[in-house]
């Protein structure tokens, strides 16, 4: 399921590239662009939901619609993934509809509505699966991701606080490859021990004059030793949280002349740049010279 979400994210980010390849002065509404964009998004959304229903959920036992409380599973790392995905999908959709010339407020509302509707559709599919269920906590974190983008765009007129993602391989996937991934790609999507979700911001974008607006401070959250979603200890290993502080780079603020490269950097701005990091865990502070 996570692979489908990231595929959607990648697809809408390519529309950001299309936006940057256009003349910035071209802001007049185009019915052709709008029709093409909405049709593409609709087809992608419907197609991916249909594919999920047939290829993923079709392999699972189906029962009547029900709720499922997984708020404590994986120490909320999967919830942060929902927030991250919803934020960036909304960001990509807003960029796409802005490219069509749609007015700012309408573009923002349409992007938020489509993003939240899409992720709600996935939760509804979960609701009919015997192995899962409709998760109210998932919906809450979905709304948080959409809301974070909408709030900043509407009230701050800028995306100052940017959710980002990083990953490093861990030894825990080897112990439960069927759950945490049997190869690198699977582990990126499944091994929460190797994932870190960050919130990056630049003091220079908040009024600190001498601070470069491309240099960011970043706060992260990760976990370690979690082998089973609802179990603090498993296989003799006890899990714990990690809170991190590091630096980051706002790739969208780098001074590059190529419109293609500028758009590409904007797309890659979902990823946290490796830097030294301070890590607080189990009441102790540690440092790493480089953290992925």
Sequence positions of predicted segments:
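N-terminal targeting leaders of membrane proteins
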Residues: 5-79, 83-90, 94-102, 159, ...
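Transmembrane beta-strands of outer-membrane beta-barrel proteins
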Residues: 114, 118, 161-163, 213-219, ...
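Interfacial helix-loop-helix junctions of multi-pass membrane proteins
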Residues: 122-143
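Glycine- and acidic-residue-rich phosphate-binding/metal-coordinating active-site segment common to enzymes
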Residues: 136-194
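Residues on the lipid-exposed face of transmembrane beta-strands in outer-membrane beta-barrel proteins
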Residues: 147-151, 197-203, 245-251, 288
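Transmembrane beta-strands of outer-membrane beta-barrel pores
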Residues: 167-171, 221-227, 251-253
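Outer-membrane beta-barrel translocator domains and adjoining extracellular loop/strand segments
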Residues: 176-178, 229-234
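A conserved mid-domain beta-alpha-beta active-site/ligand-binding segment of alpha/beta enzyme cores
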Residues: 177-224
